[in-house]
Structures are given as structure tokens and as C-alpha cells.
Amino acid sequence: MEKPIIYQIFPRVWGNDTQKPLKRGSLENNGTGKFRDIDSPTLEYLKWLGCSHVWYTGILRHSTKSSGGGCLPSHPEFVKGEAGSPYAIENYYDVNPYLATDPDRRMEEFEDLIGRTHAAGLKVILDFVPNHVSRDYGKVSPHLNGPGSSGTVYLGEKDDRTVHWSAENDFFYYPGQSLVLPDADEFRKEYRALKNKDFGYDYRIIPAWLVDRCRAFATDSPEDVRGYRSLLAQYDSLLSPYEETPAMATGNNCYSAIPGINDWYETVKLNYTDSYTGTWEKMYGILRYWALKGVDGFRCDMVELVPAGFFKWVIGRIKSEFPEVVFIAEVYKKDLYRKYIREVGFDYLYDKSGLYDTLRAIVEKNVNDNGMPVDLWQSATGITRNWQFLGDLQPYMLNFLENHDEQRFASDFFGKDARNSFAALYVSLFLNRAPFMLYYGEEMGERGMDEEGFSGKDGRTTIFDWWSVGSVRRLRKMISDGRYMEIAASETPVEEDAELEVFRRYSRALKFAAEDPAVRKGTVYDLCYCNFSSDGFDKNRHFAWLRDHEEETLLFVSNFSSREATMELMIPEHAFEWLGMPMSEDLNPQKHIRVTVPPMDGVMIRLL
């Protein structure tokens, strides 16, 4: 098994060149990226960067408040943000029309993107969200019929809504109870404010485009009371409280008719039993539909909320027809890792609860170092404990420093500056053969500190709002100008330009990881245990290891400290025996290797 490198890209934001997007701005004001923006030069850049796969996030048609760009608005009371959550799927057999230049040809445009991706030598990963769908699944847009979509009965279309649970139902119901959404009172307040033409009100539920339309009418015709009422009446379905009777269970296992503000109230929970049902068959049909279109893999959302038996069945069935399709699981319970790989059949698992959490604790301790002792959970020794826990599962773990759920490394809430990430990057990328994932803009040091709307200033790049990101715009400019190769290869100091410094380091590291045999498929040897007493080595803040393949041996050292470190590292006799390394006058157990590592950084030394 060699080392996949996955680039997660969010097309809605990636291709958006709007210079000054408005907080909670509408699609009309803030714009959106398109399928076409992921053009051949972009894909050539990703291939040059060392990527093997592109995870296109936010492709499947989801609920949205917007009415432009070919969109049909869902009820705003349950939609999060102006654009809506990409994980509240409204139609599994469709793609978002706003991503297409011609919404009527949206599926053709996505198929063209798949073709461009394959032509660039890259593989396509798509989301599979098996646990939940939007509250209005199948009620807004029609299924697009095509090869593999036979039996496209809507989820829930034939459910018996008079019972709470039935093995034949796709959802859970609460007969005699109506849904009460957490923002119901605020929604009514917003409607009263809009009715009274209070345009100073902070609207966050009623769609921005509708508020803008009402404001424009009131400005142009301030005395036309009847006309204003008529305008509101046109949108009565969006301005009346959302009705759902019987209420349905909410996506995050909230089995209640009254979900809370922190629940996934924009979604409804799918009903899986421990054995085959019609729900299983419908979800298989969805996967097969996209596999037939050329999708090479699926990132499976919130796997632990769905019975493992379903995944074992569906993965086996899909792979019997499409053996090369890969399945990646978003999982968080480390004690289930072995089951999901060895029994269920996933190809890769998130190691968020393992290596990511370990590295984050180490980084945060050193970035915010106040001179206090290092607790065990903040120590670099945790890296050793994590790989020892994983054992033979290491190559199946998906390593990352960022994704859409986590805060950007450079945000105020994590590492504060992307240049503080290099030590962690070296471990996450170079430690073993495990796949690595990069989140779009990460290679530019994107900070995620915009206040976009539904997403506040939380250190994440929004997935709920129409938005444009400055660092990503500058990256796209580098790609369109073809300057990225020159910038990466240049030796001119760029310390005064943090973005270029980060880009140079990340691009070089990723390309090396993709091309070097020792990193792609080599053996790992952890040097920390034998260097606890070595001069300059701090087991809590330093991590050292070897990667070896055939005639090549590399030494890596990460320094998580905020201070430069010089250390004398020894390579034990056991390492020479284990890796089959030849000894020499300059390389032997008695000859310590002097290494100097800048603060929060990593170095690589070629030994053989």
C-alpha cells in the first residue's frame, strides 16, 4: 500500500472571487464558485502538488434558503445559513444547481468535472451521508433519472407515518406531535419586524434575498402599503412557521419532537435496523448511481451513527461491481478502529481522535507556553503512544491537520500562525504510509477568522454561507498565472510574506511525500525511546524517527518548542538490524548525529 494524498475542496467557496462578501449576504450579493472554476490548470496544480484524490465537498443537492442560481428555497426556519449545510441532503440523485453555469445542465457539468479530474490523473471522492437527510428530502426537487437510478423511490415516500417505528419505514415519526424548532420564537419576531418594515433588525433566519427584496420595495414605494402586503403574501410559504406533523426524529439521534439549538435540527434521522431493509437497498442504489458516473471513492459521514452491518453489506456489494472504489469513514471511537477496518471493510478511517488530537494538544501547549510543566496528554510522547495503539492499522488511518469540521491551524483558536504548523505537518505527513488530507487553502496558511454569517468568527471556513476567502483567491491567481512552480522552487527568502513561506514549505513537503519511496512505502522506526537522555533532546517537545526503504534512509525530527533546539541523536543497534542499514564510520550506534531544528519546525536529513 502506497500513500494517498487527498485534497478536500469546497467548490462553492473555492471559485468565488467576490472581493468583499457581506456578512449573511445572499447568493446574489456574495456569489458562488462553479464547477468550471475547478478547471484543468487547477487540477494540474493539484497533481503537481502530489495529490492523488480530490474530495469534492458540497456537491450533492442540499437544502438552501436561496432562490437564485437555479435553486428552489427550502423553509428558512430549519436551514442553517444562507447557503445551507452541505450535509442536509435534499436530493441524493442531484447536484447543486448553483454550482453550474447552466443550472439545467448541472449534471453534465459535474460529469465534465469528473472527466477533467480523471484526465489530470486524479481520482474523485464524493460525500456519502448515510445517517440523515434534510427535513424536506425529496419535496423540493425531482429526482434526476439516469443509469443506476432505477428504483428512485424517495426516502420516506412510502412510510407509514401513523407509527413511531416500523422496519419498513425510512424515518422515525412521532404521531400526534408537531415539530417545534429551536428558533421558532425568533422566526416569528423576524416576520413581525419584516412586516413592520424594520430593516434595522438583525435578520438571521428569513432569507437575505427576501429581506433585500422587501427593503427595495419599501424604499421605492414607501406609501404603497397594499403592494408591500401583496409582496409578503407572495412568499407566504417561506414566512409562515414551518409545519411538520407528525414530527420526525432529528439527525444526531435526537429522538424528540423538540430538538435543541445545538441539535442537527436541519436534518432527519434515517431508520436502519440490524438486518436488510428497504432503506439499505435505497442507500445502495445511491452509491451505485454515483459509482456508475465515475466516482472513485466515498467519504462516509458520521459512520458510528449507522449500524456496522449495513456498511459491511453495502461496501461488499459495491466493491463486487466496482472493486477499486474506496470507502473512508469519519469515525471517532478508537476502540472501534479495528472492527471498521478488519470486519466492516473500510479502506481508511479518520484518525481525528488519535494523531490529530495528540498533535493539537502538543501544539497548543507550546504555542501558549506559560512555563508550566507539560502534562502527559500535552507531551510529544503521545505520538509514540498513538502509533503503538494503532499497530498494524497505521496505514489505514487518514491523517490531517485541517478539514471542514475542525478549526484552521492558523486560527486564533489553534496554532495562531500557519508557520507554527511545520513540526506537526512533518509528523502527520511523514510519520508513516498513512494517507494524508489537505484542506483547500491550508497550503496558504488560511486562518478561518472571517465572520461570515451563520458561521461566526470561529476559526473555521464556513460551509453554511455564501463566501469568498482572500487566501484562496490569491492561490487561484497563482494557479492561473502559472507562478506556483516558480514560487515553490525559488530560494529567495520570503519571511516577510507568510503566505508564500507557508506555500513554499507545504508544497515542497507534499511533493516530497508523494514522490519519495521511503515516505510512500517505507518502514518506520521511532527513535524517541533511545534518546530520552541524549543531549538537547526533550521527550515532551521533540519527536524523531527514521523512514527506510531499500537503499534509502531518512531521519526526521520535529521540534514543537517555541525555541530553537540543538540535539545529539543516537541511532541504536536495533534500528540498524531492523531496517537492514549498513554501518559506517559516520553512521553507527556510537556516532551521535547533531541536529538543529528551528522552533515549531521540522527537518529531514538523508542518511543513506
Model-derived features: where do they sit?
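Active-site neighborhood of glycoside hydrolase catalytic domains
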Residues: N262, T267-L336
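Loop/helix patches that line or flank the sugar-binding groove of alpha-linked glycan CAZymes
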Residues: E2, D17, T64, K80, ...
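Glycan-recognition surfaces
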Residues: A233, S320-S411, L429-N432, R460-Y484, ...
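The substrate-binding groove and active-site-proximal loops of carbohydrate-active enzymes
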Residues: R12-R36, P86-M107, Y265-T279, V295-L305, ...
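N-terminal structural segment of carbohydrate-active enzymes
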Residues: M1-K123, N131-P142, P147-V153, E157-D160, ...
